Amino acid sequence: VLLCLMVFRNADLGIHTGQSTMLLALFFVIMTVCPHLANQFSPVLGMLLNIAALAVLILFGCHNPSMFNQSTLVLGYLLLYGYDVTGKSYQMRLVGMALGAALTCFVFYRNHKNRTYKRNLKDLIQEFDITSSRTKWQICQILCVPIVLCIAELCNMPRAMWAGIAAMSAILPFMEDMHYRVRKRIVGNIAGVICFTVLYFLLPSSI
């Protein structure tokens, strides 16, 4: 909630403020309900639900890659997925998310109501073009993140959400940036494993 509030007080969705505000409310509903439901299903069924949920978040909330709204919406979704709760705790989460949605929408509308946007929700749908680099990036996010999550869960990896977060952060709108980040991440991961292994054997077990 705090992340959304801090981001969307300045960032926008590139369309009419009223429609953007309604979309924000919808995003909160999706982030509140879908991660919890996906955790109740098998990894494969959960993957399908995650694909559907992320499709709405990314296609309508991440239309402008330069805003990096995926770092807010997709990250928030994955964190809620990874730290799922049940019972009384989930009821408290519902209350917290509802209050957070109301506050975020209020701040967003107040800060953007005087701005003029030429596009609306219909324009976002019409601009979906499978041949454009933006749409290809969106589809890659929509499909790859849930697939990586599913694979991690099928392999019984603890906190599979971190695999999804790693995939999300590596899938960038511009191909040259993505290639650069992936190369650097491979080198960094190898160096990290080596350092951890060395420290594991050098440091006393009492630490």
Residue ranges and their predicted role:
Residues 1-207:
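Alpha-helical transmembrane segments and their membrane-interface boundaries
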